[in-house]
Amino acid sequence: MNKICSLLILILLNSQLLNAQIINGKITDLNTKESLIGVNIISEEGSGTASDIDGEYQLKLTEGNQKITFKYIGYEEITKTFNIAKNEILNLNIALSSTSEELNTIVVSAGRFEQKIEEITVSMEVIKPSLIENKNTTDIQTVMDQIPGVNITDGQANIRGGSGWSFGAGTRVLVLVDDMPLISGDAGQVQWKLIATENINQVEVIKGASSALYGSSALNGVINIRTAFPSQNDIDKNKFPGYTKINTHFGLIDKPKREELNWNGDKRRAFKGIEFLHAMKISSLDLSLGGNIFLDDGFRQGEVTDRKRFNINSTYKSKKINGLSYGLNANFLFQTTGSAIIWDSYDRAYIPLNNEITTTAGDTYNIDPFIIYMSGNNRHSLRTRYLKVINDNSTKGRDNEQDNKSEIYYTDYQWQKNIEKYNIRITSGTTNEIVYAKANLFNGKNTRTNNSIYTQIDKKIGKFNLSFGARYEQFTIKSDKKYVINGDSINKFSAGKPVFRTGVNYQAAEATFVRSSWGQGFRFPSMAELFISANQGGLEIYPNPDLKPEKGWSAELGIKQGIKYGKWVGFIDIAGFLMQYDDMMEFTFNQWGDPSTAPLLGLGFKAVNSGNTQINGLEISINGQGKINKNLSLNILAGYTYMDHFSLDPDKIYAYAGDNQGVSYTNSSSDPTVLKYRYKHIAKFDTEITYKKLSFAASYRYNDFMSNIDYIFTTPLVNEGIPGIFEGIPGINESRENAKDGDYVIDTRLGWQMNDAFRFGFVVNNILNREYMTRPATMMSPRTFAVQCNIKI
């Protein structure tokens, strides 16, 4: 019976095809010959489809004269006119040429589909892989800190002043790799070291609340690292299967300017590393294998790093089912690192407080199976992730009972529908995340679940691009331990909230685009912020199970102006922005413990809801690349950000410390007129000039004085201590006095492209050997020198 039914269905389908006119073919890049996925094929009569994962398409038509248009972002549009007879099957292969004299920056993060950057409704910066390679990047955070409006402090990203110092727990900026979150399940820490710097296509940074499309941690923005597919153009250049990249480097850390800071004598600390990538296509399989080995003696005493990382990216395109592809991506990290939080003193700034270094032997890995199916104008994707983080912590060679382990099971199903006739694209999906965590410092075993549904609609009307999105999220954390809150003994914490966003982009002139957007954000506290009880680097960290979720919104009005000089193209972007947060969560330094019994007189950190806040400001940036003339090319990324940030209720008591003393923003701040651990002015630029085979580049980063920190850091209790009881943390006030005019750092680099296979570089970071800090009581690296050799065969 089943065979008969199958035969009848087959006959019915064939009869429909026999009584229809069909055009089919394959669409490729004119220069690289690579298949183009998602090209829109639209007939004049209104029907349409899109090319599949192999670049192939098929479209039913009525008989007679037809006019078909092939449209793809970043490529010249092609229109074909022809006559198709009754029941004819016409094969038409198309080769599209790129619009080479446009900036041609295509992004996916703003709406989870490909768009030109000038047409999106939010502010976004894009980093290309050349900057990552040429800066001798051993950790992607280095490049993130070069982006206008972005700062990285202790591994936490801060966009336009949206975050202060979060002590490495929780994040308001969601970091993704190929649309998948890369944040630990317990502490909410970004797993920067797991990111394969050797296989990056581009980095996209959304500035502003993006929770509607990406979820809780996107309250302040999104950083999406997009990995590269094997390039057919590069493969065709080689006699061997695929192509291989090998980058090696060796560097030295210079002595600090002040002799008091030189804890290592005349011996120079060194760092060295190698990273490699092999990419190939085997029939219908795209495969990339990569890895990195990095050894760093460290510029601080005891902060030694031994890191090994390996990765695989694979995609198989089904030969049996058109439009079906599936694969597996994975990263494996094995490392031993030392970390310190606070210096011993201003004159011993590269020595940790009380010589206490936390050494972490950690294994981190993610395994990501996925499946994608494209049919006509529909796209279905199912992405899954297993992320495991294991940290074995010790202090001075002894187990400190602060080990932690977490596992994440993550699933995201997404459906996209492109209705070409009405210029509408619908993106909808559901996300599920389960976290299992075990750690003494988080009071045993904890479980977290996060379920959400989301949708976004994008519509093009003439020169307008409109966008609307919504999401609902529900969080639950369950702990083995019960906590007494408002007289109730509980071990379950839950919260849920809908969030919305909307935006519009208008093309006012040929190269002028005006945009406006508004979006809500929501963030549930991490397990670390709720439950942590630990001593790290000599400082106590206290739990706060009474912590509430934070929420907020952001809005902006911006204009993007295209500029062109010969074959050099770029954009100037100006944006005004406004953000408000309710119940903002911040780690705050105060006397949270009992002064008579707790270590360090009860001094330490705790996450608290510090009230309602506002941040508004202005940002100007420029991003461009291309040739000035036949032999000279110029790449530039630059920007200035002004931020005015303050508490909306500075006198409100939001916590109690010490002997039950009320804590408000006013009495806990060194400057209560602004928010803590933030700047008001940030300026950055990176410029690279290439003449024939030689290149020279300079990077500059400036921030003004961080006027507001936790007030207790500035008191005699902390700076001078109490003789015989507490030695204090000397030099915080002195260092701040010396930084009153702000800090700036200049990096330089030279490059020589010997031939297509070999490139050599010389990189000097902090060339002026300046003393600078990103927060109180932590001195950043003195000058470093590095030589690099990049091979591509």
Where are these regions (language model features)?
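A beta-strand signature from Gram-negative outer-membrane beta-barrel systems
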Residues: L92, L194-K245
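Flexible loop and strand-edge segments within Gram-negative outer membrane beta-barrel domains
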Residues: D296-N311, T315-Y373, N378-H380, Y386-Y410, ...
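Gram-negative outer-membrane beta-barrel transporters
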Residues: N247, F577-Q580, L603-I712
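Extracytoplasmic beta-strand/coil segments of soluble accessory domains associated
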Residues: M124, Q141-M180, S184
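Short acidic/polar hinge/loop motifs at secondary-structure boundaries
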Residues: Y57-K60, M180-A209
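Structural signature of Gram-negative outer-membrane beta-barrels, strongest in the C-terminal barrel
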Residues: I371, E420-T431, V435, A439-M579, ...
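Membrane-embedded beta-barrel scaffold of Gram-negative outer-membrane proteins
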Residues: T384-R385, V389-N393, R515, K548-G604, ...
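Short, acidic, small-residue-rich periplasmic hinge/interaction motif at the N-terminus
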Residues: T28-T32, V39-E44, K71-Y75, A85, ...
